[in-house]
Structure formats: structure tokens, C-alpha cells
Amino acid sequence: FYYFCYGLTKNMVIAVSVYTFFQMCLLAGSVAYFISTLRSHKIRPFVLLLITAFYALIPYHAVFSVTVWKDIPFAAAVLFFSCAILRLSVQNQICLKNLAVLFISGVMICLFRSNGWYAFLLALPFLLFGFRHKAKAVYPPLFAALLLAAVVKYPIMSAFRVEQPDFIESVSIPMQQITAVICNDRYLTEEERALIEEVVDLTYIRDLYNPTFADNIKELVRAGNQDYLVSHKDEFLNLWIALGLRYPGDYLTAYVNQTYGYWYPDSFYLVAEAEGVSATDLGVSHTPLIGGPLVIKTKEIAIKLGSMVPIYGTLWSMGVACWVLLFSISVSVIRRDYHKLICYLPGVALLLSVLAATPVATEFRYVYFLVLCLPFYLITAVLPEEADAPV
């Protein structure tokens, strides 16, 4: 969008504005598709209004709609994909529109975030099993999404010299666990210490180690000899396993410190407090059409209310979103609606990918897809079997 519009207008502000408008429409479209899905299931208008209010009145949705991050269209793709699964499985709406949504949103999930690719691969076998009775209709868009994403991700991106995340990005948690063992002055054999020192200088590792933030140690590895780590993966895997068996408490503590924000309910995170355009020399500037102190103060209060109002503040908690997902799955199991479990697959697979490789303990945008899909998870758990039975 940016390069196309810039080529037409030669104006960077217009090009960025067009992309921002597209992102706003994409996010709004995903919500509209969700509401339409519920309407087709005869959900009561009052419930639909409550869900609409969640998206319209919670301020971080509005701020994120104009925030140029890949996490925002990614979250919209997850909601599209989840709703398409609901339509195709529970509602049995096999049509070209829903299959097209499944395909396009599947490609977006695979390409917009690196963990999305792995989550899609993790969920795919279960999706294939869940749709085994509708294989002729559903399998083609799923495999087509996988094939197109693989072609774009590897040969095309390689041809255009698009850099993929380096290896250390995918091993943030094991790296933090090994670092915790070192910083706790645990015993290491001479061979283990020598292997680690082939990659990093241990002189300042205690000063750099942050239990909730892996970037310091990642940069230490990059400043050292990351190539040695990549070429000796087996040795470092054995080292990680050996230290884990020897010091399980250190590993568990390091893991909790690195991931608690995504599953601990009392983990408020100030969201969307920064708005505007970061200072650059590219000519893009923040030019609000509606300004004034009243607007600014209203926005500030709306954002800060999450830290002031107890129940309302749970909507700012990533941990609460995680437990809502688990609660919804539990309700479906208790009600013996096992066929609905397939609708939770994208969220579960993506959450597991975050918990397996997050570089920071609290980052709302990493699990914004979970928050955007909150009403979907809750309403899916209580959907009646018959489409004409209102909720």
C-alpha cells in the first residue's frame, strides 16, 4: 500500500495515511464479520450491542486501529480466521465467501508474525482432523494458504533479500534460563563454561541480565559469536537439558519471570498511552484534525481508567485474557460441545507460541489477538446447538 500510493502521489504523508485507513477498515471489517457471524446464529440484539460497545468504547482499540504495527492486522486476521472456522464447522456455512476468508486470513497469520507461521503449522493437523468430514471444501483453502505462505516466506523473501529473524530470537527463553543459572552462581563443569564462552563474554553478564527482558542478553550474543551457537545447536541443546535437570528451580523461576504477564491475572499493562508520530526526518508529522485540551484530557482519562477502576481494569490484563480463553474451552468441554474446540485452535496455538519464545514478560501487542477475540471466545462457549435458538 505504502509504495503503491507513494508511487502515485510522491507524497509520504498520503501514502502512510492510505495504509492507516486500510488498517482501520481491516480491523473494523474483522469485527463486522464477527457480529455478522453472531447475527446468523440468532444472537439477541442486546448481546450484539454489548459486544459492539466492547470494540467501540474500549480506548485501546481505537488507538491501535491507527498504530502502524504488524500486530494489528495480525490480530484482525486471527479474528477473521476464528470466525471462518466457526461458520464452517459449528454453523455449517460452506460457501465461497467463508472459504475465501479462511484462505486469506490464514495467509496473513502465517506472514504477519513469525510465531504465526509456527502456530499455523501446530494447528493445521488438528484443523484437518476437525474438518475431516468436510475435507473437499475446507482442505483446499487450508493447504493453499500454507503453500502460498511458504512460497512467500522462503523463495520470494530470499529473492528480495528480506532478512528473517536471527536464531537467537527463537531461543529467548532457553537463553534466559541458562543465564539465570550463571547469574545464580551455580556450578558449571569446565566443558559447559567453555562452551558458553565460545559464544558470549561472561564478564558483564550479571550486569546485563534482566529476568523479564531478554534483549540485553540477545545483544550480548550478537556481539559475541552467534555463528558458533548456530553451528553447534546440538551441543547447546544438550547443555540446556543438562542444566535444566540439574537446576530445575532456576529454570522454572526464569520461565515464570519471562512469561508471567501473559497468564498472571494481576498484571496490568498501560496500553496505548503513546499516540502520534515518532520524530523522524522523513516528513511525516502528527496532524490531528480534532484537537484541543478537552479532547486530550478525555483521551488521557479514558486510557488511565484501566488502572483506576478494578473490574474495568481487567480488560487491560493479558493474564485475564488468557484465563478467559481457558475458561471458555472448559465450558465447551463441560457442556460436551467438543466440536467447538476447533474454534479455539488459532488462539491456543498462538498463545503457546508466545509462551514458548517471548523476549519480554509483558508486551500487550504480542497478545492483542487474544484481547480482540475475547468476545468470540466467550460467546462461542455458550452458543446453542440450533441456529434458531437465541442467546
Task: Give residue ranges: language-model regions.
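Membrane-interface anchor segments at the N-terminal boundary of transmembrane helices
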Residues: 14-18, 253, 257-344
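Short helix- or helix-capping micro-motifs
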Residues: 48-59, 79, 106, 110
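Short acidic/glycine- and proline-prone juxtamembrane loop motifs at membrane-interface regions
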Residues: 63-73
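Specific aromatic-rich, kink-prone transmembrane helix
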Residues: 74-91, 104-106, 123-124, 373-377
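Membrane-interface alpha helices of multi-pass inner-membrane proteins
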Residues: 98-113, 124-125, 144-150
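Membrane-proximal stem/loop segments at transmembrane-domain junctions that anchor or position
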Residues: 162-291
